Amino acid sequence: MTKRKKEVIDVDCSEKKDFVIDWSSAMDKEDEVPELEIVNTTKPTPPPPPTFFSDDQTDSPKLLTDRDLDEQLERKKAILTLGPGLPDKGEKIRLKIADLEEEKQRRVLEGSKMEVDRSSKVVSSTSSGSDVLPQGNAVSKDTSRGNADSKDTSRQGNADSKEVSRSTFSAVFSKPKTDSQSKKAFGKELEDLGCERRKHKAGRKPVTRLSNGWRLLPDVGKAEHSAKQFDSGLKESKGNKKSKEPYGKKRPMESSTYSLIDDDDDDDDDDDNDTSGHETPREWSWEKSPSQSSRRRKKSEDTVINVDEEEAQPSTVAEQAAELPEGLQEDICYPTRDDPHFVQVCLKDLECLAPREYLTSPVMNFYMRFLQQQISSSNQISADCHFFNTYFYKKLSDAVTYKGNDKDAFFVRFRRWWKGIDLFRKAYIFIPIHEDLHWSLVIVCIPDKKDESGLTILHLDSLGLHSRKSIVENVKRFLKDEWNYLNQDDYSLDLPISEKVWKNLPRRISEAVVQVPQQKNDFDCGPFVLFFIKRFIEEAPQRLKRKDLGMFDKKWFRPDEASALRIKIRNTLIELFRVSDQTE
């Protein structure tokens, strides 16, 4: 090993040794250890993370100022005039308007409440102080203060409302206390705020009275569901009570309002529906109805009724809901399975007869068939009527708007719906309409041979939601197509109506616009259609003439009569299920 390598090894060994410090020699014994000093330092608060709002949050009425709230409300109402042309027919706009009006009303009530609380505190501090004056002194003091304030009107502008509120409440406490005052000390104030009315009508939503004598009913879509456990057989006394809404006042020399429209139709088709064929009525009677959840209509429009035109009418005793027994069979066929036009009803279909539910096609078709069976024995008019089921109008609409090259063959297949029935020999044809989750009714009135007034089409709608013009137009085209088909044969040898009317039938079909009772909610359109049929069959003459149109009126029957039909149909079906279960 060389000397140089040995020196390198010695250096490396010395570097690897621990370095030891002699603190006793490095530090003097008299030196003191410095004290630890803790200094509080405030770190700057980090800026909050950016907040991202969704469209719903930015459009929330609570985030708007009063001015912006009023501007949005006016703008939405202006847009609502275009509702029929919108994809959802203005439904979303109506809901937005309802939210804005609710927020505006909340702010008004909240501001009034804050003013009352502030005035109450002023009154409390005044009455508890030692300088409470008698009534005369208080009046003189207020008078003198008023004179002093009148000298400087520039400082009075912002305090006018507060001074009026304070003086009003102070006057209540400055007067001698009497029994009547103790009971109605704040009667006027509570009446202005609407609290007195809510006290007498607990649990009910307030009715807004407008300056023109009309009243604004709350949104029926937000009403509370009062009927529970309906299918379990619980008797709903509240659900069966007749509506307490006042009804129409009879005016002297008042007749029904209607007009006759007799115009020629153009044969231009509106829609292009390419449909291959039509099923028979029997095939359609087994079709599943849409679920009840999809039948909910959202309606946020307020209903306005005229108080001056209504008065209370004695309501009839409502029929009680029967209990639903257990162990019933799943379905029945009415009147029997052997009947060629029987209607099948499942036990589950009874759910639509619960309060606030929308009637389904099986129940509607059942009751129309039930009316035919019940009235035929006592009234001859039922034999001269033809009832199409609830699925017919959709097929009618497809047939009259079909634009294929085989239009004639298409109509021949469509005629299977009334195979073997001469429609023009009937006195009345009933066509139920179901569109946009709403029910309405069309009645075709056919005259006899002595009457040359022509055919009349009636459209009865308890809410006025359906397009009367398009529905009547489709029915007219249907009657014309049937007339063209029958004219190809020797049908004219034995005409059921006047020869003059028959030769010019396309121009002798008119529409009579009539007024009918209107429902007070948005879920009784089905019972109203069935009650229209029931009442019409009971009261209509053998053949309807123009002079008979006076039977139609908004006071034709009470709305609660039609609403009560829901319970009657349910009880009838339960009894039929019982009888069918016993026989089988």
UniProtKB/Swiss-Prot annotation:
Residues 99-120, 142-165, 176-196, 221-253, 275-286 have a biased composition (Basic and acidic residues). It is found in: Nucleus speckle. Coiled coil: none annotated. GO terms for molecular function: deSUMOylase activity; SUMO-specific endopeptidase activity. Residues 28-64, 99-323 are annotated as: Disordered. Its main location: nucleus. Its EC number is 3.4.22.-. Residues 197-207 have a biased composition (Basic residues). One of its GO terms (cellular component) is nuclear speck. Induction: Constitutively expressed. Proteasomally degraded upon salt stress. InterPro entries: Papain-like_cys_pep_sf, Peptidase_C48_C. The N-terminal regulatory domain is not required for peptidase activity in vitro. This is Ubiquitin-like-specific protease 1D. The lineage of its organism: Eukaryota, Viridiplantae, Streptophyta, Embryophyta, Tracheophyta.
